[in-house]
A protein has these predicted regions:
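Short beta-strand-loop/turn "lid" adjacent to the catalytic site in phosphate-handling enzymes
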Residues: 62-95, 116-118, 148-171, 196, ...
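Active-site donor-binding loop signature of nucleotide-sugar glycosyltransferases
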Residues: 30-32, 197, 270, 447
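Carbohydrate-associated surface elements
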Residues: 98
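N-terminal glycine/serine-rich phosphate-binding loop of ATP-dependent small-molecule kinases
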Residues: 1-90, 136-137, 193-194, 209-216, ...
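Active-site core segments that coordinate phosphate-bearing ligands/cofactors
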Residues: 4-5, 102, 106-157, 168-179, ...
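Short glycine/proline- and charge-enriched loop/turn segments
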Residues: 32-36, 160-163, 439
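Short loop/turn motifs at secondary-structure junctions
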Residues: 66, 188-191, 361, 378
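A conserved helix-loop-beta module that forms one wall/lid of the active-site cleft
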Residues: 182-200
């Protein structure tokens, strides 16, 4: 049995076939149009998202000869409001990166309601407030809801709990919409889709050739975790534009909806029947974006960043702190800014590249340290995926700094693999135990440094991070 995986990321839509052994074949990709009409605003075209998802899926289906089931994974918290009568969006899709509702969040916090601008809650209200006519026909959609609606040709209006739990609009156990929050935001409960499990038959995807059954809806980070065979335990870090860690906790719901002292959140990563699986989540705001920026300056080629870093034996005293848009976990200082330290006339692009990759690796270890402070268990092996996972120098440096084996996913985009495997579990063809055996590891990087050397480097790193904090005091004083 084979699954079609549809993966809507922040800048592209991907599709592929995933088989019961976890092999990913017949991949197709199309770029999304991302607009930023004003500083801090990030929009996508809802119609384009649906059209491209179906188009790339059809390309995969034509090449592969068809599939049995479909799994969908997507960037979380990106928000759409649409007219249920026509299936058309009433405005742009507001990306999870969109910050236009920052002031709304601060105003609501003063009234006792804590919401963050990267959640869906205030984005929904912003979109609804810009509708002047009758609103009873409006419906809210995260991207899983939007794709399920279009793949089923309007028959399915649902959302899964891994997507719902990052909207800011559900109860702590992610079992139902929080009517108190909806009331506070003056949002009609009829706008919101029924909450469903991540894995399980939902209905035919009639917009696709053969009408395969839609059997999984899952947020991107949960799909990445699942795609790397982290089922009942395990920790992964996805190093993409930013970096996101997830470390499985178990089935006990969180005690709070808010940011923990460690700078992590607790989020749902899978739900089946009465059981929801939870994980700690930590975020680095700038990771691969730093490598891309360095290349755009003409100082090094993105694809050759590993070779450039390895062309010199040391950083020659140069240190880089990646904080283009602030520091996430554990600091959450939006006013921090990125910086190079220790520059001299002898500093070359190779020294800077090496320092840059070192800095991103350090930030990854900051995430692991946060899990430890929260009482979580990282384990002896950390799994990694995402664009930076193909950089062997970076992966080795991450292993050296964290003192653990680092298992690199054979699939750079483990989200695609995870959504397909989730669909095969949803239809009953695979069990969770089966998936746990499908590690899909390309290679393992083993740490080379002593405990004393790691400790010394980590102490020096923390000192440099502190020097970047509070660069823009007004932003550093903001918290959500």
């Amino acid at each position: 049995m084979r699954a079609l995986s549809i993966d809507v990321g922040s800048s592209s839509v991907r599709s592929a076939v995933v088989d019961e052994a976890g092999a990913v074949t017949f991949p197709h990709r199309a770029p999304l149009t991302v607009r930023s009409p004003h500083p801090g605003e990030v929009e996508l075209d809802p119609g384009e998202i649906a059209e491209l998802a179906i188009a790339v899926a059809e390309s995969t289906l034509r090449e592969s000869g068809g599939v049995d089931v479909v799994g969908v994974t997507n960037q979380r918290a990106t928000t759409i409001v649409f007219d249920v009568r026509t299936g058309r969006a009433i405005g742009p899709a507001l990306s999870w990166q969109d910050l236009r509702t920052v002031l709304d969040c601060l105003t609501l916090r003063a009234r006792g309601l804590r919401l963050a601008p990267n959640q869906s809650a205030t984005k929904v209200r912003w979109l609804v407030e810009h509708v002047t006519e009758e609103r009873s026909h409006l419906r809210f959609a995260t991207l899983d809801t939007w794709l399920a609606w279009h793949l089923s040709r309007g028959e399915l209006f649902v959302t899964d709990r891994t997507n719902a739990c990052v909207t800011g609009l559900v109860t702590r156990d992610a079992r139902r919409w929080n009517v108190d929050v909806l009331d506070a935001l003056e949002l009609d409960p009829s706008m919101f889709a029924p909450l469903v499990d991540s894995a399980g038959p939902l209905g035919p995807a009639r917009a696709l050739s053969g009408s395969p059954t839609l059997c999984a809806l899952v947020g991107d980070q949960a799909a990445s975790l699942f795609g790397q065979a982290c089922v009942e335990r395990g920790t992964k870090v996805t190093f993409g534009t930013g970096a996101i860690l997830n470390s499985i906790l178990g089935s006990t719901p969180p005690e709070t909806d808010y940011l923990l002292e460690s700078g992590c959140y607790v989020t749902a990563v899978r739900s089946q029947g009465a059981v929801t699986t939870w994980a700690l989540e930590g975020i680095v705001l700038s990771a691969g974006a730093c490598v891309q920026w360095f290349g755009e300056l003409g100082l090094g080629d993105v694809s050759g960043s590993s070779a450039l870093a390895e062309s010199v034996p040391t950083r020659d005293g140069v240190v880089f702190v990646p904080a283009f848009s602030g520091l996430g976990t554990p600091h959450w200082d939006f006013g921090a800014r990125g910086a190079f330290f220790g520059l001299t006339r002898g500093s070359s692009p190779a020294h800077l590249q090496r320092a840059l990759l070192d800095g991103v690796a350090h930030r990854g270890v900051d995430l692991l340290d946060a899990v430890g402070r929260e009482g979580g268990t990282v384990g002896d092996v950390v799994r990694v995926d995402g664009g930076m996972s193909v950089n062997r120098f970076f992966v080795q440096r991450f292993a050296d700094l964290c003192g653990r084996d680092v298992a690199v996913s054979a699939e750079v985009e483990a989200t695609t693999r995870g959504a397909g495997l989730m669909a095969l579990v949803g239809v009953g063809h695979l069990t969770l135990a089966d998936v746990a055996k499908l590690s899909g590891v390309a290679y393992v990087a083993t740490p080379r440094w002593s405990l004393d050397e790691r400790a010394q480097r980590r102490d020096q790193w923390r000192q440099h991070v502190e020097r970047t904090r509070g660069t823009i005091p007004e932003l550093s004083s903001v918290s959500f």
